[in-house]
């Protein structure tokens, strides 16, 4: 029983599509190698998967094959791309040259060729630049003053806290000294003979003895 004809259309199932791609890709690359060997042909095959991954085979240098293709067909594959790239490069060069000229004018160089209107525009540009510089300078000064004020306030707060700690330490030391003094006084009075502890306000007590 012969094989049925396979309908050529996109395989919807992604797994089946990947399996079919791998098999047929390997088959194409194998055939390309075979024909290059059997027939001494110059073959180049490039395959891009839907994922963007590339597979290739080239019997000789791909650059040599492309050069031969250009010579035989008279067409270059990247003429349009190169033309767009050249245009972009020329535009960048022109913009750079104009910027260099404007920079020299802003420095006061090469201004003899400028007409009155161009000189007025240059003056406006310089005035605007000077205004921007002054505004930026004022902003920086305000920021520096604000930062200095904040640092001074923080320093004052730290000094106040330090004074409070010193006062608390001094009070604590004075309290400890007072406690030691009272303790020593009590011990001294306890050890003193009774006769020496009689108050001078009552001299008659000694006469009674």
Curated annotation (Swiss-Prot):
Its main location: nucleus. Pfam families: K-box (PF01486), SRF-TF (PF00319). It is found in: Nucleus. GO terms for molecular function: DNA-binding transcription factor activity, RNA polymerase II-specific; protein dimerization activity; RNA polymerase II cis-regulatory region sequence-specific DNA binding. PROSITE patterns: K_BOX (PS51297), MADS_BOX_1 (PS00350), MADS_BOX_2 (PS50066). GO terms for cellular component: nucleus. Residues 3-57 form the MADS-box domain. InterPro entries: MADS-box/MEF2_TF (IPR050142), MEF2-like_N (IPR033896), TF_Kbox (IPR002487), TF_MADSbox (IPR002100), TF_MADSbox_sf (IPR036879). Residues 82-173 form the K-box domain. GO terms for biological process: positive regulation of transcription by RNA polymerase II; regulation of transcription by RNA polymerase II. Transcription factor involved in the genetic control of flower development. Acts in conjunction with DEFICIENS (defA). Mutations in Glo cause transformation of petals into sepals and stamina into carpels. This is Floral homeotic protein GLOBOSA. It comes from Nicotiana tabacum (Common tobacco).
């Amino acid at each position: 029983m012969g094989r049925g004809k396979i309908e050529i259309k996109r395989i919807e199932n992604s797994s089946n599509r990947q399996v079919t791609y791998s098999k047929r890709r390997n088959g194409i690359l194998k055939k390309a190698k075979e024909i290059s060997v059997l027939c001494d042909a110059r073959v180049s095959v490039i395959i891009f998967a839907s994922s963007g991954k590339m597979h290739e085979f080239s019997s000789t240098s791909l650059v040599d094959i492309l050069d031969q293709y250009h010579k035989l067909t008279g067409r270059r594959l990247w003429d349009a791309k190169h033309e767009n790239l050249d245009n972009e490069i020329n535009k960048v060069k022109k913009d750079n040259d104009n910027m260099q000229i404007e920079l020299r004018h802003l420095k006061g160089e090469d201004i003899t060729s400028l007409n009155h209107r161009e000189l007025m525009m240059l003056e406006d540009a310089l005035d605007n630049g000077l205004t921007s510089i002054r505004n930026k300078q004022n902003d920086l000064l305000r920021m520096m003053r604000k930062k200095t004020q904040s640092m001074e306030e923080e320093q004052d707060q730290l000094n106040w806290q330090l004074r409070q700690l010193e006062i608390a330490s001094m009070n604590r030391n004075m309290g400890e000294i007072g406690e030691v003094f009272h303790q020593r006084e009590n011990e001294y009075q306890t050890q003193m003979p009774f006769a020496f502890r009689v108050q001078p306000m009552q001299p008659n007590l000694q006469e009674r003895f």
